[in-house]
Regions:
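Vicinal oxygen chelate
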Residues: 1-6, 9-19, 47-52, 72-149
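Short beta-strand/turn micro-motifs at beta-sheet edges
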Residues: 1-2, 68-74
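A generic structural micro-feature
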Residues: 5, 41, 55, 76-78, ...
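Core segments of cupin and vicinal oxygen chelate
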Residues: 7, 15-61, 65
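Alpha-helical elements of the RecA-like P-loop NTPase motor core of helicases
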Residues: 24-25, 95, 132-133
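Acetyl-CoA-dependent GNAT
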Residues: 64-70, 137-138
Length: 149
């Protein structure tokens, strides 16, 4: 590769996916992530999902479906508390995500107002049972802007 980061960077989280097509579809419907790359070889399939506006500082979700693990079924890594967090723009957006998740049978935590700094949250389970938290007013974005500009 010709391009490399100027300094050490946090670049990805990797999760196993039992059915990579179903999992890519789930993440592109329920989160702001978009498919960046997809590969397949004899060892299995892989996909990178991320935010298209992060070209200069990418952070991606890596989904991997190893051929040798296909008969093992779901392998949730992020459960019951470990989770990926996504900050949304409004309380109503949390409610809408929870409504959609409930309709599809993947709502894990209903919308709940938690004490600071947690904020208003809900969580869904992805097709492999991993927890994805959606929060409003959690403050991660605000704190990063305050401290790092």
């Amino acid at each position: 590769y010709v391009k490399h980061p100027a300094a050490m960077r946090w670049t990805h989280i990797a999760l196993p996916a039992t059915n990579i097509d179903k999992t890519i579809d789930w993440y592109t419907r329920f989160t702001p992530l978009e498919l960046l790359d997809r590969r397949e070889d004899t060892d299995g399939q892989g996909a990178w999902l991320g935010h298209p506006d992060q070209g200069d500082k990418p952070f991606v979700l890596v989904l991997v479906s190893f051929t040798k693990d296909q008969d093992k079924g779901q392998q949730p890594i992020m459960a019951p508390f470990a989770h990926i967090g996504i900050e949304v723009t409004s309380k109503e957006e949390v409610d809408e995500i929870a409504r959609r998740g409930d309709a599809e049978g993947c709502l894990a935590w209903p919308p709940t107002l938690m004490p600071p700094p947690i904020g208003y949250i809900c969580a869904l389970k992805d097709p492999d049972g991993n927890m994805i938290e959606f929060s409003y007013d959690q403050g991660v974005y605000a704190k990063a802007q305050e401290v790092w500009g």
